Amino acid sequence: MDKLKEKGFVKLEIYLENKKRLHSIFLKEDTEDVEKKSLYLINVPITTTEKILKRAISQLGGRIVNIYPNISGLLKSGTHLRVKLVEPAEVKQVIKAASKKTTSLPWKFTQHTGLKRYVESYDRQFVNPRVLAESVDSYMKRVTKKEIAEKRRLFAMKNQPDEDGFVTVVRSGRAPVGRPQDAERQLEKKKDTGIHKDFYRFQLREKKKKALLDLAHKFEFDKQRIQQLKEKRQFKPY
């Protein structure tokens, strides 16, 4: 610590674990920064996050715009950081505030430590039920919208022969009562196109059968996937 003071570092005492323990961080201006907006921090607590660091420096009068290296996960003991502030004057202000013997900051952690930290990390591997429900609802809305568009397309094709003379058979709800002449014409058409309709009924049955098989396969796949996820949740911390 004396060597750090000799090199121009200022000691800042912070409270850890609800003011039960003091921890020392050492600060110094980065003289190699031509903009004179950077600070060196030595011995940063291992559970420090970007949010915690920004809040602490702001209490000393500085506004952090960049942290190097990026903070991600648990830090190593005695971690060194370089932070860049908005204005050069803020560097002077932070060092001045930290150098006062009466200055001590509460270092409020936003996450648990020890076993609780690993439990939280494990739980984050799984999708939040609310987020999952919203995702499913959104997906079902898209499917419903697509089905409606498909029904409209099929309805537009109803009784319209294609290039080969085939007519797409589309099942609909209640049909309006037609005139006797229309009924007679429909009977004549049925006599002429009975074979075609039987052929299309067969196609529709096969298509429906295939769709049901696909749904069954997807159901089995999803069931196996859910089982795998349940097995993975057998968390053993020791």
Curated annotation (Swiss-Prot):
Keyword set, alphabetical order: Cytoplasm, Nucleus, Ribosome biogenesis, rRNA processing
A GO biological process held by the record: ribosomal small subunit assembly
Cellular component annotations (GO), alphabetically ordered: CURI complex; cytosol; nucleolus; nucleus; UTP-C complex
Pfam families: RRP7
Annotated compartments: Cytoplasm; Nucleus, Nucleolus
Disulfide cross-links: none
Function: Plays an important role in the synthesis of 18S rRNA but is not required for the 5.8S and 25S pathway. Is necessary for the cleavage at site A2.
Family: Belongs to the RRP7 family.
Record-given protein name: Ribosomal RNA-processing protein 7
